[in-house]
């Protein structure tokens, strides 16, 4: 069933705009008035396929920063029954800003912490969620597509997400990506975390989640001894001294083996301390997307498990991947936005050593050729997402005066390479990039 939202102001103007941008839409369904109050600039008598999230902060307080939560109510309507039986979700919780560079952008991302666990739109049952704005990605599909690649590859956990339309304090903010927050839990990143008070050697041999990010702004952090990776404790966030030193020693031991003369030795080499399979999967996702945040510099997470090995548990942050950044030189002579050329292989610590291992290269070829037919279907996957978004896109990129969110499809946005002029052109670029990237990688991986 398709849902309708009604606006008494200038509905004909926006209906005409939606027709121009999205090749026409109309409806004869009955009008549904939004609750609990009429938004200032809701969509007028226009069909919606994706769910609608309505958030109201206490006393309509502004969300000013990433540190301070504000009490809020959250209502989610999936009237189109895309992910649920159509029963609305209604709950309370707290909301704050999130992100690094993305928080400085006009379209803000948010972190939500519900008062009670909830299974939102068919995803995991949890309290913590994020609303990704994807402001720099005018296709609004790069994170979604990368998560699909992660699912195909078989990462231990792929964050689930849903495209939604967001109303905040009666103002329509456009298309957002409701996504599972990065955390350790049975339904997300499933790790057996170290006990809070563990200090003995046997007890320290448990699981830890680390964040690798050049911002290096955590309370407990260190650089590794060889590659100088900036590692911060994610969970536990506040390790005791014994836990801190144990984790640091394990990473330095792994790097000593990886960068040592005997790194290929099956008994003392790097394979004793680094899980090759998980890094292989991670590599394929990051190389295929040509993600400038994927070269072990930021938005990367590593797990140290009880077996003493370092694992790649999941992937995150792809809004400027797939040729969407103009500030990275992938390699000498290669375009920063083009689909050709290695990136992770040549420009990432650790991986430049992995590729000196014939066993790693052989495993890569085998896995790539098994997965390639599924990768070839990615343009079709993207089109399916576009079909779901088609009515919402017109509202996201139309003016607030005509009922839209006011985000422009034109003009310069950091770090985009160019203004492609239309949403259709943005989608076409993404599809073409993936097709060409697959062709280049298929040829060059098999030639290794």
Predicted features and spans:
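Bacterial N-terminal signal peptides that target proteins for export
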Residues: 2-13
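Bacterial Sec-dependent N-terminal signal peptides
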Residues: 19-47
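Hydrophobic alpha-helical membrane-insertion signals
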Residues: 40-98
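Short, solvent-exposed loop/turn and secondary-structure capping segments
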Residues: 65-67, 122-125, 142-143, 176-178, ...
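Conserved oxyanion/phosphate-binding beta-strand-loop segments in alpha/beta enzyme cores
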Residues: 72-133
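Middle-to-C-terminal accessory/interaction subdomains
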Residues: 101, 105, 232-296, 300-448
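Internal "kinase-insert"/substrate-recognition segments embedded within catalytic cores
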Residues: 118-119, 133-134, 155-159, 171-284
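A conserved alpha-helical element in kinase catalytic cores
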Residues: 135-156
